[in-house]
Amino acid sequence: MTAQPLKAALPLLFVALSGVLGTPVISCINEDGKAVDWFAFYKLPRRTSRGGTGMGLDYLYLDSTMRTWSKSHHLINSSRSSLGRTLEQLYEAHNAKNDTAYLIYNDAVPASVNYSGNYGHAKGLLVWNRVQGFWLIHSIPKFPPVPEKGYEYPSSGRQYAQSGLCITLKYSQYETIDSQLLVFQPNIYSCFIPNIFRWELIHMPQMCAKSSASKIPSRRLTVLQSAQGLNFLHFAKSTFYTDDIFAAWIAQKLKVHLLVESWQRKNHELPSNCSLPYHVYNIKAIRGPLQSDFPSHHDHSKWCVSTKDSQARWTCIGDLNRSPHQALRSGGFICSKNRYIYQSFDRLVSHYASCN
C-alpha cells in the first residue's frame, strides 16, 4: 500500500476500531450532561441599576434540540453549566494524556495582566480524538484556566455580556480547521497533540510547539460541517488583510446587509458603513429577554445577523470588533443559516445606528 492510500485509510480504521477500544465520543454537552450537535450561549451583563439585578453569571442557552433561547438552569461559573459540562472532556484529556488532543487559545491569557497583540484577537478551544471532537469559539477574556486548575469562570468576565458557539465535529473536519488556525494565528497557551495526528494535521502541532514556519495566507473561507450535517462557513483573516472583516468581506460575500454587535469603546469605533453594495450597521442596544434592554457598550460579545429584508438569514459569531485597530488584527467568524440560531440572535436586537 502506498503512503497516500495508507494516510486516507488510517482515520477510517481508527473509527472502525473505536467502538471496540472504547474511544470516548467527544461532543458539545448540555446542562443535563447530554451530547448535542451544537450550542450557543449569551451571558448577560452584570446589572446594578433599576430594571436589572443580575450578578453577571446568568446566560441564555440554545442548542440543536431547541427553537429559541432558554434561561440557563445553572450559573456560568458552575461546573454544571453547559460550558462546565463540555470542558469536563478537556480535563479528562489532560489527566489521561492518551490519544485525545486539545488546544486552548486566548489573546488575554488567564492569570496574566498582559494582552497579546502579536497573535490573533481570538478566543476558543478544541478537544478531539480520531472519531470526533468539538470547537468552542467565544468572547471571554482569560477563559478557561489551564486544564490542571479545573473549571473556573473569571471574575473579570462578569461585567459585560459575552457570547459563544460550540460545534461538534467529526475528525474529518480537523484538517480544514488546521488550515483556518494557520490564517488567524491564535495565541495558544495550553495544548497537547499526540503524534498520531501528525499524519493529517500540520499547522496546529507546529503552533502548539511555537515553531510554525508556514506561509500565512491573507484570508481563507471554508465550509465546515457539524457531526449531524449542519453546514457552517468560517471566515479567517490574517494581519495581512487590513480591512474591516464585516463590511469588506462577510457582508459582500454573503450578499446581505448586516447588523453587528461588537465591543466598541468610545472614540475607537467604526461607524455604520453604507459605502459598499451590502451595508453594515452597528447595533446600539440589546433587548434583554430576562431583564431590561442594555446598551451595546455593556456587551463584549461579537456577532452579527443579516437584516430581515435580506434574501438569506445569516448569523455569525466570532472574534473581532468593529474598530480601526481591530482591522489590523487576525481573527475569524463562523456563520450559519440555521433558522433558530438566526431568530434567537435577531430577537436580541433592540435598535441600531443607520448610516445617516
Swiss-Prot record:
One of its GO terms (cellular component) is extracellular region. InterPro entries: DNase_II. Its main location: other. Liver specific. Glycans are attached at N77, N98, N114, N273. It catalyses: Endonucleolytic cleavage to nucleoside 3'-phosphates and 3'-phosphooligonucleotide end-products. One of its GO terms (molecular function) is deoxyribonuclease II activity. Hydrolyzes DNA under acidic conditions. Does not require divalent cations for activity. Participates in the degradation of nuclear DNA during lens cell differentiation. The keyword Glycosyltransferase does not apply. GO terms for biological process: apoptotic DNA fragmentation. It is found in: Lysosome. Keywords: Endonuclease, Glycoprotein, Hydrolase, Lysosome, Nuclease, Signal. It is an enzyme of class 3 (hydrolase). This is Deoxyribonuclease-2-beta. Belongs to the DNase II family. Inhibited by aurintricarboxylic acid and Zn(2+). Residues 1-22 form the signal peptide. Its EC number is 3.1.22.1. It comes from the Eukaryota.
